[in-house]
Amino acid sequence: MTDATTISPLDQARILSEALPHMQEYDDETIVIKYGGHAMGDEDTAKAFARDIVLLEQTAINPVVVHGGGPQIATMLKRLGIVSEFAAGLRITDAATIEIVEMVLAGSINKQLVGYINEAGGKAVGLCGKDGNMVRAVKATRTMVDPDSHIEKVVDLGFVGEPDKVDLTLLNQLIGYELIPVLAPLATSKEGQTFNVNADTFAGAVAGALKAKRLLLLTDVPGVLDKSKKLIPEISIKDARKLIADGTISGGMIPKVETCIYALEQGVQGVVILDGKVPHAVLLELFTNQGTGTLIHK
């Protein structure tokens, strides 16, 4: 994107004027933004993201941020000499690992992002799904085919959960006081056990419960790509399911798109998968005619 210092004052005014209809469209609407990918590890990118979140709040939008932390968790586990195993794209989380995961997600990452947003002039509050019993989870299960026996087996993922219930009491209070919730994807079972939850899945559950206007999933890829590796700007749920069935959508993109479909079916009006490494990706998506990434809708 062109640096603002190289744009004439007239062009800057024109850009702001063209953004006005989009600002009006999202006035007093809730936008859930899942911030993840390797862009989180870059301080300048993280601070730019924080400024964009503050801008949303200043334009009468209600932003709710959910963050991931896979690379940072991996770095900490490696530093401590703990080897991670993965199954079906999810980290197998034992008792020792869940303590580290909670420390990294709810501690260092969450508070750092809260600090960046507050430094930019916002009023962010750092929480996780455990706070106020916001997100209840059940133990996640996955099956995999054994390569030797070719028999499908259930994989024990340990303390990995999937959202089962979202209580909006605390979130609605924060939004009502014009505070910016920043959520780490941790939840508890009804028995009080802490679970690590995939950040996309967590964001989808929160967005669905809030009936958000938009759910934005910031990732390391431009969006959903066709078989020629070109960006698909917009697809319906029906089209998305066809692309999964024919193999166009594959690998790690499948659970992301399934999260999008779930959120839409729960009442979210539109979900966008976009590249978090693109400067001001959130603003480009919400405040420009062309947007960015892939919009999935009903």
Curated annotation (Swiss-Prot):
PANTHER family: N-ACETYLGLUTAMATE SYNTHASE, N-ACETYLGLUTAMATE SYNTHASE, MITOCHONDRIAL. It holds the Pfam family AA_kinase. GO terms for cellular component: cytoplasm. Pathway: Amino-acid biosynthesis; L-arginine biosynthesis; N(2)-acetyl-L-ornithine from L-glutamate: step 2/4. It is an enzyme of class 2 (transferase). This is Acetylglutamate kinase. The record marks 34, 256 as: Transition state stabilizer. Keywords: Amino-acid biosynthesis, Arginine biosynthesis, ATP-binding, Cytoplasm, Kinase, Nucleotide-binding, Transferase. Catalyzes the ATP-dependent phosphorylation of N-acetyl-L-glutamate. InterPro entries: AceGlu_kinase-like_sf, AcgluKinase_fam, ArgB, Asp/Glu/Uridylate_kinase, NAGK-C. Substrate binds at residues 69-70, 91, 196.
